[in-house]
Amino acid sequence: MLRRGALSTILKGLNGLSLRSPIPIWHVSASPEVGSKYNLPTVPTTSHVSYRQIAKANFFAGYRPLSANQICVPKVESKTQVSQSQDEEDQPQEYVLSLEDGYLYAQSFSASGSVTQTQPARISTQVWEQICDKLISITPLDLTSVKRKRKLKMNKHKFKKRLRRQRALRKRLGK
């Protein structure tokens, strides 16, 4: 008499699934029909970023304005404000660079902190590549092998162990 195995009994209970055609995970994120048919969660696609884009973002991260949604509204100046603004013109202005959709926006700020003007400028890809190459070449790389790191760690451990032993010996000898 042949007996049915436990695995085949479990598989008989699973009517909706087919073991001969498993669903690859990339189909779940690609088509919503597969996810709804088999009641599986969908996964958003991954957008891969090149190292050049990361270098650009890191470079311009320090030059972003404090508020990205800051809107400059011109104000009507009175005579006293005009005289103050003439004094401010003698002082040096600060410029803040921001990058949006491939355009570099240079905003000049007066000493009081108000935005005086914004100038968009398109930067060519050749200039971007030069900036990225310069940033990447400046960044120091610490190429220490795993074997060397382990050796340094063990030497440090042995040195500390020897110091502790010597300190304990001095303490016992009464020095």
Curated annotation (Swiss-Prot):
GO terms for cellular component: matrix side of mitochondrial inner membrane; mitochondrion; ribonucleoprotein complex; ribosome. It comes from Schizosaccharomyces pombe (strain 972 / ATCC 24843). Component of the mitochondrial small ribosomal subunit (mt-SSU). Mature yeast 74S mitochondrial ribosomes consist of a small (37S) and a large (54S) subunit. The 37S small subunit contains a 15S ribosomal RNA (15S mt-rRNA) and at least 32 different proteins. The 54S large subunit contains a 21S rRNA (21S mt-rRNA) and at least 45 different proteins. PANTHER family: AURORA KINASE A-INTERACTING PROTEIN, SMALL RIBOSOMAL SUBUNIT PROTEIN MS38. GO terms for biological process: mitochondrial mRNA processing; positive regulation of proteolysis. Keywords: Membrane, Mitochondrion, Mitochondrion inner membrane, mRNA processing, Ribonucleoprotein, Ribosomal protein. Coiled coil: none annotated. It holds the Pfam family COX24_C. Belongs to the mitochondrion-specific ribosomal protein mS38 family. The lineage of its organism: Eukaryota, Fungi, Dikarya, Ascomycota, Taphrinomycotina. It is found in: Mitochondrion; Mitochondrion inner membrane. Component of the mitochondrial ribosome (mitoribosome), a dedicated translation machinery responsible for the synthesis of mitochondrial genome-encoded proteins, including at least some of the essential transmembrane subunits of the mitochondrial respiratory chain. The mitoribosomes are attached to the mitochondrial inner membrane and translation products are cotranslationally integrated into the membrane. mS38 is also involved in the splicing of the COX1 mRNA. This is Small ribosomal subunit protein mS38. It is a peripheral membrane protein. SMART domains: DUF1713 (SM01155).
